Amino acid sequence: MSFSLASTLPAWQAVQTHYESVGKHLVLKELFAKDSSRFEKFSFTFNGLKEEDGPILFDFSKNLITEETVELLVKLAKEANVEGLRDALFAGEHINFTEDRAVFHPALRNVSEKPMKVNGQDVMPGVRKVLRHMKEFSDAVRSGAWKGYTGKPIKSIVNVGIGGSDLGPVMVTEALKPYGQENLELHFVSNIDGTHLAEALKKCDPETTLFLIASKTFTTAETCTNAKSAKDWFLASAKDPSHVAKHFVALSTNEKEVTAFGISAQNMFEFSDWVGGRYSVWSAIGLSVALYIGYENFEAFLSGAHAMDEYFCSTPLEKNIPALAALISIWYSDFFGAQTHLVAPYDQYLHRFPAYLQQLSMESNGKAITRSGDMVNYTTGKILWGEPGTNSQHSFFQLIHQGTKLIPADFLIPIESHNPIDNNKHHRMLFSNFAAQTEALMLGKTPAEVKAEGTPDEIVPHKTFVGNRPSNSIIAKKITPASLGALIAFYEWVTFTEGAVWNINSFDQFGVELGKKLAKNVLAQLETKGDVENHDSSTNGLINLFKNGF
C-alpha cells in the first residue's frame, strides 16, 4: 500500500495499542520463568556460510517481546511494503529517488552467475572486470612483482579517503588482521587535520610506499588536499613526476581529474554511481582490503555478504533475521522511546565495528522527511554507538545498568578466537563476561537480594539494579572474511528495513552538504586579511579569534 507517515498505518496503531496494554508491562525474568522454550522460540541461526565460517546465532529472546509482539511488528513491515521495496532494490529500480539512482551494492558481491540489471543493462560484466583488475593488482603488489621507482617492492600502503572511502576499509582490515600479509603495513588517512597525514608518513619510505586515493568524484576537499600533500611528500624524494604512476592509484570514477593528478588511467579502479559511499567497501574502495588479506579472502568476504543477501530476499519476514532485528529496534525507538542503540563486540579485532555501523545507520536513517515529503511525527535514526568488551564494561556500562535511559544493546562474540592464549583461558573469560552482562542486564538485582548480602539499609538502593534491560546476542563461529561479510550485510538490511518502515530514503545524505558549503566560505575568509562581520556574533568571534590569535 502507498502511505506517507508510518504512524497512520493500521498496523502501527495496533502495535501502539499492544505497547500500552502489554509491551510496557513486560518483565523479562517473568517471561523466561513462564516459558522454558523462550530461547528456542526467539533464536535464529544463519546457516548460509561454509562450515569453516559459520553458522551465526542471533538470540532475540532477551527482548521485551512476546509472540504477539512479533506478529504485530511483522504486520507493520508488510503494510509498510518492506518486501516490495526490497524487491525494487534488487530489480535495480531507482529507489534513491532524491538522487535518481539505483541502490545496487548487492551486485558488487553477487558471486552467482545471475545477471543484475540497472536501466535494462546487466552490470555484472563491469563488476567482474573491476574485480579482475583488483585481483591482478593485489597479486602483483603482494608478490613483490609491482616495484616502486627504485625497483624495491611495496612495504607500506596508505589509503587516503574519508567517510565510506575510509571507515569500511579501516574496519575490515582491522577485523581481518589475522589474515593480513605481515610484510605489508597499512595506514589510513582521512582527517583534514595535517596530524593524521604527518603521523602516517613518519612510518613510510617514499621508495616503498603505495598511495590509494579513494574518492568517487576525485573532488572531495579533504581527500584531494591530503592526496596533494602526499604527492608533494613523495616528489620531495622521487623528484620526477613520472614516478607518481608507480606509487599512486585511484579508486574513482573521474578519469579526467585522476589523470590530471598524474595517475595513469590504467591504475584507476572504477565503481558506479549506484554505489553509495557507506556501501562501498564491496567495490574498488575495498582495494586496500584485497591488498592486505589477499584477493581470495576478499572474494570470501564478498561471498559471505552475498549469502546474507540471498537469505534476506528468500526468507519470510516472520523468520527473517535482519528484518526481525530492525522491527525490534523500531519497537524500542518508537514505542518505548529509546534514543540510542549500543553495539558491543567482544572481539578486539572488531574495535572499529561500532564506528563503521554508526555511519551505516545514522547517515542512512538520520532523516525527518518521508519519501512523500512530509515531516515525520515519530522517531527515526537511532543513535548507534559502542566500544569493545570487556573495556566498555569499565567505562559506560554503569549507565546502562543503573542509569535512567533504556539502551537496547547488541552483544557480539565469536566462539573461536584467533588467539587462544593460555589454553584459551582469555577467551573463556571473555565469553563469561559476554554472557554474564546480558544476564545481568535482564535480571537486575532486587533490594532483597542486596540486603541478604549484609548491605546496610542506607546503601541498599545504591546497589540495586532494576534489570529488564533488553539485548540481542550474536554469536559467530569465528570472525573470518565470509562471516564478517555476512555480519556487515546483516546490519545493512537492518538499516534498510528500518528506513522502509519509517518511509524515509535511506540512501541519500544531504545532511552532510550544508556544513561543507559554509566551510568553503569560511576558508576563503581565513585567507584574507581583516576581521569578518558577516556572520552571527558567535561565528564572527570564532573566526576572528583564529585569524588573530589570543
From Swiss-Prot:
InterPro entries: G6P_Isomerase, G6P_Isomerase_C, Phosphoglucose_isomerase_CS, SIS_dom_sf, SIS_PGI_1, SIS_PGI_2
Enzyme class: isomerase
Phosphothreonine modification, residue list: 455
Reaction catalysis annotation: alpha-D-glucose 6-phosphate = beta-D-fructose 6-phosphate
A GO MF label: glucose-6-phosphate isomerase activity
Entry-linked PROSITE patterns: P_GLUCOSE_ISOMERASE_1, P_GLUCOSE_ISOMERASE_2, P_GLUCOSE_ISOMERASE_3
Annotated active site: 363, 394, 516
KW Ligase (keyword) present: no
Residues where D-glucose 6-phosphate binds: 164-165, 215-220, 359, 363, 394, 516
Keyword S-adenosyl-L-methionine attached: no
EC number: 5.3.1.9
Key words of the record: Cytoplasm, Gluconeogenesis, Glycolysis, Isomerase, Phosphoprotein
Entries under SUPFAM superfamilies matching the protein: SIS domain
Functional note: In the cytoplasm, catalyzes the conversion of glucose-6-phosphate to fructose-6-phosphate, the second step in glycolysis, and the reverse reaction during gluconeogenesis.
UniProt similarity note: Belongs to the GPI family.
Entries under HAMAP family matching the protein: G6P_isomerase
Name the record gives this protein: Glucose-6-phosphate isomerase
Annotated source species: Schizosaccharomyces pombe (strain 972 / ATCC 24843) (Fission yeast)
Lineage: Eukaryota, Fungi, Dikarya, Ascomycota, Taphrinomycotina
The encoding gene: pgi1
